[in-house]
Amino acid sequence: LVYVGRLSAEKQIERIKPVLNALPDARLALVGDGPHRQQLEKHFEGTATTFVGYLAGEELASAYASGDAFLFPSSTETLGLVLLEAMAAGCPVVGANRGGIPDIISDGTNGCLYEPDGADGGAASLIEATRKLLGNDIERQGLRNAARSEAERWGWAGATEQLRGYYRQVLETNLT
């Protein structure tokens, strides 16, 4: 399992730990750095988690490509460009069914969505979505291929235009 991004509280990376507890053979690579790293190191202590640090270029592409799944637990993202990076590398995504994420991820087609709400903070849904993605090699390969195709369709121009659209909506709402 792979997470790439800033290690900060708003990314809700702690939500991944129940997945590791439920899937004892799973290993997690946290790629990136940030102000929340020390807290995360304590939180994930005793799990099969590696704090990789910052990567770029071919090393980052290799990290994405080596993952069976990219876990993106944040429920507050307007558009996670790292999702497109993961998908372009053929790493299927498990992401929250919130914000701009469902605009990119079609559940069961090019990745899996989880419901981040609930008394358990979405843990059961995240575990179920991750199990679903990891459970069948043939289906996962189909998700990989569809993820690559979707990333090609979006490209950076499409992602940027979507973000501009969100800003236009906010401005129009606030001006009226």
Where are these regions (language model features)?
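Conserved donor-binding/catalytic core segment of Leloir-type glycosyltransferases
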Residues: 1-11, 17-21, 29
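Nucleotide-activated donor-binding/catalytic signature segment of Leloir-type glycosyltransferases, i.e.
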Residues: 38-58
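Short alpha-helical donor nucleotide-sugar binding micro-motif in glycosyltransferases
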Residues: 54-55, 62-67
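Aromatic "clamp/platform" in nucleotide-sugar-dependent glycosyltransferases that forms part
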Residues: 75
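Short hydrophobic beta-strand element within catalytic cores of glycosyltransferases
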Residues: 92-95, 105
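C-terminal alpha-helical cap of glycosyltransferases
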Residues: 132, 156-176
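A short, well-ordered alpha-helix in the C-terminal region of glycosyltransferases
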Residues: 139-153
